[in-house]
Amino acid sequence: MNIKFVVVGKLKEKYFKQGIAEYAKRLSRFCKFSIVEVPDEKAPENLSQAEMDRVMAEEGERILAKIKDREYVYALAILGKERSSEAFAKEIKDLTTYGHSDITFVIGGSLGLTPAVLKRADTQISFGKFTLPHQLMRLVLTEQVYRAFMINEGSPYHK
């Protein structure tokens, strides 16, 4: 099984890098885990709607270029469906049972994801109505993917 994150921007904070590295190490016994970073589009403060649309379109094209046809894609979106950790674990298990060995999660930049990226996604997932920095979301998502594997294994990690 392959789990891939396609994310906008680089991770700068050492503490996020360390947390993700720890969960990536733990995930290595269950899957091949990778993170593909696409450059964020530089944009000035106080963007007009047209400038926001341009920035999102550029980032969206970069994201879509990193997704293969065979990949099952989750887009992280505030308007996506919320799931419990148990329901998410069952989804991952069901996807593998039904032949989806390549699962990709997309985390957009500060302006979100374009309609084209959301359309390409097989499903949209939300971690609630909070707005979180995409760097933090990367760590939270990595932990939740690890938790899903632990739930499916029957491990006491998920209490």
UniProtKB/Swiss-Prot annotation:
Enzyme class, first EC level, given as a word: transferase
EC number per UniProt: 2.1.1.177
Cellular component aspect of the GO annotation: cytoplasm
Coiled-coil parts of chain: none
Residues that, per the record, bind S-adenosyl-L-methionine: 76, 108
An MF annotation (GO) of this entry: rRNA (pseudouridine-N3-)-methyltransferase activity
SUPFAM superfamilies the UniProt entry points to: alpha/beta knot
One Pfam family matching this protein: SPOUT_MTase
Keyword set, alphabetical order: Cytoplasm, Methyltransferase, rRNA processing, S-adenosyl-L-methionine, Transferase
Location(s), subcellular: Cytoplasm
Reaction(s) the record says it catalyses: pseudouridine(1915) in 23S rRNA + S-adenosyl-L-methionine = N(3)-methylpseudouridine(1915) in 23S rRNA + S-adenosyl-L-homocysteine + H(+)
CDD domains: RlmH-like
Primary location group: cytoplasm
Top-level taxon of origin: Bacteria
Gene3D superfamilies for the chain: 3.40.1280.10
PANTHER family: METHYLTRANSFERASE, RIBOSOMAL RNA LARGE SUBUNIT METHYLTRANSFERASE H
Its job: Specifically methylates the pseudouridine at position 1915 (m3Psi1915) in 23S rRNA.
Family assignment from sequence similarity: Belongs to the RNA methyltransferase RlmH family.
Family matches, as NCBIfam families: PRK00103.1-3, tRNA_RlmH_YbeA
Record's subunit section: Homodimer.
Protein's name in the database: Ribosomal RNA large subunit methyltransferase H
The species this protein was found in: Levilactobacillus brevis (strain ATCC 367 / BCRC 12310 / CIP 105137 / JCM 1170 / LMG 11437 / NCIMB 947 / NCTC 947) (Lactobacillus brevis)
